[in-house]
């Protein structure tokens, strides 16, 4: 019984206020785009950070299966260490602390959540049409050094969303909220005032 991105989006919408501003990072951005697809009239503004509007590539799906097998065998720590490779993050003084935070979060959530989220990511739908239809203030933000969801994906989203703002965070990879929190928060503040 797999949970889909659509299921996750519907669950969050059911627990959310009638109107709200929405921010999504990485998989959270994928869920945020689906929330926009399901209930655009409820979302006052949207910010998409280090995310991907496209379906998962076959080669990425193929890489996930050995990870899922390893996690089922009790090797979540190994998979996270290998998957979170430091190259997801920019080189910088916060790198080790950010990696530790990510590892702690993964271990706290546990293998079932990793497996559920992996399946949801594998089965996600293309959101380019959703992006073209967005008509609220939109911030698209990414770390310049993000190799998981590269700048080119964010440039595509910026082209698709009319009147969007694209902010590129220097000295940050996939997690600018943790790698460069001050700069990221400044972008968020500007977007919230818009």
Whereabouts are the PLM-identified features?
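Residue in the alpha/beta-hydrolase core beta-strand immediately N-terminal to the catalytic nucleophile
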Residues: 21, 44-47, 132
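Active-site loop/oxyanion-hole signature of alpha/beta-hydrolase fold enzymes
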Residues: 1-23, 38, 186
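Conserved alpha/beta-hydrolase catalytic His-Asp/Glu region
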Residues: 56-62, 75-133
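Catalytic active-site module of serine/aspartate enzymes centered on a nucleophile-bearing elbow/loop
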Residues: 163-194
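Gly/Ala-rich beta-loop-alpha elbow adjacent to hydrolase catalytic centers
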Residues: 24-28, 32
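Short beta-strand/loop motif that positions the catalytic acidic residue
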Residues: 134, 140-142, 146
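Short alpha-helix in the alpha/beta-hydrolase fold that links the catalytic acid
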Residues: 136, 150-159
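Flexible "cap/lid" loop of the alpha/beta hydrolase fold
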Residues: 5, 37-82
């Amino acid at each position: 019984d797999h949970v889909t991105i659509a299921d996750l989006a519907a669950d969050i919408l059911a627990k959310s206020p009638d109107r709200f501003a929405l921010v999504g990072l990485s998989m959270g951005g994928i869920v945020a785009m689906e929330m926009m697809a399901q209930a655009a009239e409820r979302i006052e503004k949207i910010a998409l950070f280090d995310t991907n509007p496209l379906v998962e590539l076959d080669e990425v799906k193929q890489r996930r299966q050995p990870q899922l097998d390893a996690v089922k065998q009790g090797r979540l720590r190994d998979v996270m260490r290998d998957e979170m490779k430091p190259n997801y993050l920019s080189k910088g003084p916060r790198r080790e602390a950010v990696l530790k935070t990510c590892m702690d979060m993964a271990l706290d959530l546990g293998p079932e959540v990793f497996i559920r989220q992996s399946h949801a990511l594998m089965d996600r739908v293309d959101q380019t049409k959703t992006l073209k239809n967005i008509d609220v203030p939109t911030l698209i933000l990414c770390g310049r050094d993000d190799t998981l969801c590269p700048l080119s994906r964010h440039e595509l989203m910026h082209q698709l969303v009319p009147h969007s703002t694209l902010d590129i965070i220097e000295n940050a990879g996939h997690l600018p909220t943790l790698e460069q929190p001050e700069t990221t928060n400044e972008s968020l503040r500007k977007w919230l005032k818009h």
